[in-house]
Amino acid sequence: MTYVGMTPEGVSIALPPPVSAKLICGEDAPADGFTGVFPLLKSMGKLVRIKIYDKSRKLCFHGIVDEQKESCGGGRKLALAARSRAALLLDNEAVPQTYCMPSLSTIYEKHVKPYGFSECRGDGRAFNGTLTVTKGMSEWQAAAAFCSRFLKITPRAADGVFDASGGRPQGKLVFDNAGGIAYTSVCIDNRYCDYLSEVLVKSGTSGVYSLAARSETAVSLGIRRRRCLTEGDADTLIRSAEKKAFRVTADCPGEVPADLFMDAEVRDAALGAVEHLYVSQMEYSLGANGEKTSFILRR
């Protein structure tokens, strides 16, 4: 990894190799996060941005510095904590309003583009219905609410792009100690406690709750766990529960370049082949024991 700090004036400053570092991005967190400690020869002045490039010189993180610490005593150190641009959508409150026949392009122009995003991907047509942005909602919550309700998609904000297309990056990660990506450990985690067997939804006219979605996987496992909704998408709730109930973790030595949502597969002599996975979370870390990349894979 190569690290470059940026001053408020836009001047780039190459940072020395860090003593420790952690870079994490995942589908469940809108903003990617970085923390790092660097050796310090003299004060760097104010750093407001940080860029991180992987070993192929690809930009893998462009973040806003949330906290900068310079210290001496026990060694001179520069500590940085940063989040990706999506943090601006989390930190800013949306103006309460109601949209009639909302569209992705309208939501993007109002709630996302003003914070430095340059591109929007997804279905731009207008939808029947209304979207209400209530007091206290963040810009991210407003944009994500539209995507969830009308597009049935969880958006992703990265590299200046607000992506609500549902597309996945090309390529596939194959974790295999006999010819693929080497790993030090793999764990298959079945969390049966997270499954929902059925979801009932309340009728708007009669007020009666009726079955709206069922998980055949949960039923086949003998699981009975029901939820009742007054409003919301029952299928999305079932799918979300199924996704949380199964994951594979893989720890790999060194730096492993990858993209979120990339297809993945694990092959192990004892555990067998685990297919039809995708990258749900990636974490690169550097410390006293060297560097490693950890993955959470889901279906």
Residue ranges, per PLM feature:
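Assembly/oligomerization scaffold segments
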Residues: M1-A94, S148, R156, Q170-K172, ...
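Acidic, small/polar-enriched beta strand-loop surface segments
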Residues: M1-T2, K42, S56, A144, ...
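Charged- and aromatic-enriched interaction segments used to assemble
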Residues: C72, K77-Y192
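Solvent-exposed, well-ordered amphipathic alpha-helical segments
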Residues: M1-E9, S20, E67, A82, ...
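Phosphate-binding glycine-rich loops and adjacent basic patches that engage nucleotide phosphates
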Residues: G10, D28, D66-R76, M101-K110, ...
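Short, functional N-terminal and low-complexity linear motifs
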Residues: L15-P18, S71-L80, I107-Y115, V199-Y209, ...
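Short, acidic/charged, Gly/Pro-enriched secondary-structure junctions
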Residues: M1-E9, P39-E70, M101-P114, P253-H276, ...
